[in-house]
């Protein structure tokens, strides 16, 4: 597939040819990365085609978050990131499959069916932005937008072998993103390489008055300023990687060796055990999800239950029929931790621990420029591999820290396991220092000269 950098130099006629080719390939593919062929979404805006995750509003398109409860909902406005794309010679072209309401790590909970990993179709692509990552890795998209709440851009990028960037919280507008966990959610790019990630990030970043959490900063110019000659002081968290598989640990050590050879300084640091971070993350995210998803009641928009007797039954049947099992589980747990008897014991304590984690990251960044960790403890698992929801939640063990602290993080493919499955590694940077993330990743990408195709 042509890169985003290359596509931006195409004429309008060449872009139309590109779009027609993508549309035909999507129709012929069995990955199920797209909800439906792009042309069926009425994708007519001019510009380089960018795949959009099905929780980002595009005016006139049916946006469902891959859930039955939003069946028939047509977005009445553009998300701010879509308007930003239009201002930078890009446009939405197709909607990607995802875990329902972005709640999952495998893209198995979508009402549209599973998405397959293009590297091995018997394996998951990761989630929740699995459709976006599978399409980019499978040659079905020039680039894509995803959303990252606890690793939902970085983990599928790692499983599929592409680049995924979660920007600093507030760097990219969330206006028009259908919320899962408002204090964690962030839109970001999934691309074929670091240069493309930089280009797409620059296009969507910047202050937005329509988003009260948007940082009052100008759009970035990271692509223009990409510099592979910079050298950094990078922290490793040795205690943090003990749960990774042997293949991931080997890739981690080999990548550290490459970083040292480039000239970066490596130091060891410690942070709160990642298992505690998992508990904190899920308490807060489920609490916010239970609040955010209360609006889907079958009255105002989306699916409405039939043959109902009263308002209570309308609410009950619409939500019971519309939500999948994982979403119901998180709503119930979220309501539980917010209930009067348990609010202080769970939710309040989790918020206090979240602040402590943020302070720990800030303390580390007083002495270093970047933190280096794996993205996931394993390579992409087989479908139905996770024996329980808890086992699935643990696949986010290395990614949630950046969401808890609001920091930017990038997933970069660095190796393959003996089965040929991609392995990604993650850099975390100081708040609003995406430039350093992209610079170190660009230099490492060029050094490794890794080709996963």
Curated annotation (Swiss-Prot):
Keywords associated with the record: ATP-binding, Ligase, Nucleotide-binding, Protein biosynthesis
Keyword Protein biosynthesis: yes
Catalytic residues (positions): 53, 128, 152
GO CC terms: glutamyl-tRNA(Gln) amidotransferase complex
Coiled coil: none
Catalytic activity: L-glutamyl-tRNA(Gln) + L-glutamine + ATP + H2O = L-glutaminyl-tRNA(Gln) + L-glutamate + ADP + phosphate + H(+)
Group of enzyme by EC: ligase
Gene Ontology molecular functions: ATP binding; glutaminyl-tRNA synthase (glutamine-hydrolyzing) activity
EC number: 6.3.5.7
Described purpose of this protein according to its UniProt entry: Allows the formation of correctly charged Gln-tRNA(Gln) through the transamidation of misacylated Glu-tRNA(Gln) in organisms which lack glutaminyl-tRNA synthetase. The reaction takes place in the presence of glutamine and ATP through an activated gamma-phospho-Glu-tRNA(Gln).
Protein name per its UniProtKB record: Glutamyl-tRNA(Gln) amidotransferase subunit A
Organism from which the protein derives: Helicobacter acinonychis (strain Sheeba)
């Amino acid at each position: 597939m042509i890169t985003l950098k290359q596509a931006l130099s195409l004429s309008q006629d060449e872009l139309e040819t590109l779009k027609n080719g993508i549309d035909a390939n999507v129709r012929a593919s069995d990955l199920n990365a797209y909800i439906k062929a792009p042309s069926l979404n009425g994708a007519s805006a001019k510009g380089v085609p960018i795949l959009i995750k099905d929780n980002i509003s595009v005016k006139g398109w049916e946006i469902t978050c891959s859930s039955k409860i939003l069946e028939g909902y047509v977005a009445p406005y553009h998300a701010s990131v879509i308007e930003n794309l239009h201002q930078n010679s890009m446009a939405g072209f197709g909607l990607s499959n995802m875990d329902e309401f972005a709640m999952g790590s495998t893209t198995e909970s979508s009402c549209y069916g599973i998405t397959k990993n293009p590297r091995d179709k018997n394996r998951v692509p990761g989630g929740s932005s699995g459709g976006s990552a599978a399409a980019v890795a499978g040659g079905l998209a020039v680039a894509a937008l995803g959303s990252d709440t606890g690793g939902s851009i970085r983990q599928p990028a790692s499983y599929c072998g592409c680049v995924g960037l979660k920007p600093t919280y507030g760097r990219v507008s969330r206006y028009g993103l259908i919320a899962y966990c408002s204090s964690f959610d962030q839109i970001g790019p999934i691309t074929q390489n670091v240069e493309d990630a930089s280009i797409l990030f620059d296009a969507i970043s910047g202050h937005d008055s329509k988003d009260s959490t948007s940082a009052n900063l100008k759009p970035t110019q990271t692509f223009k300023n990409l510099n592979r000659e910079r050298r950094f002081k990078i922290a490793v968290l040795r205690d943090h990687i003990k749960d990774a598989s042997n293949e991931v640990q080997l890739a981690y050590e080999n990548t550290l060796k490459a970083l040292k050879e480039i000239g970066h300084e490596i130091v060891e640091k410690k942070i709160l055990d990642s298992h505690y971070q998992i508990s904190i993350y899920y308490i807060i995210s489920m609490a916010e999800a239970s609040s955010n998803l209360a609006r889907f009641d079958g009255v105002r928009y989306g699916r409405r239950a039939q043959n109902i007797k009263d308002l209570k039954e309308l609410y009950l049947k619409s939500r019971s029929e519309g939500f999948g099992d994982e979403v119901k589980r998180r709503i119930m747990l979220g309501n539980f931790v917010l209930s009067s008897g348990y609010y202080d014991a769970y939710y309040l304590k989790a918020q206090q621990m979240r602040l402590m984690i943020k302070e720990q990251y800030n303390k580390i960044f007083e002495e270093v420029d970047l933190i280096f960790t794996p993205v996931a403890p394993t390579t992409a698992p087989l479908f139905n591999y996770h024996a329980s929801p808890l086992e699935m939640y643990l696949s986010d063990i290395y990614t949630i820290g950046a969401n808890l602290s609001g920091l930017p993080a990038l997933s970069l493919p660095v190796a393959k396991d003996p089965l040929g499955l991609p392995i990604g590694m993650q850099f975390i940077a100081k708040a609003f220092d995406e430039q350093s993330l992209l610079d170190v990743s660009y230099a490492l990408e060029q050094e490794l000269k890794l080709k996963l195709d």
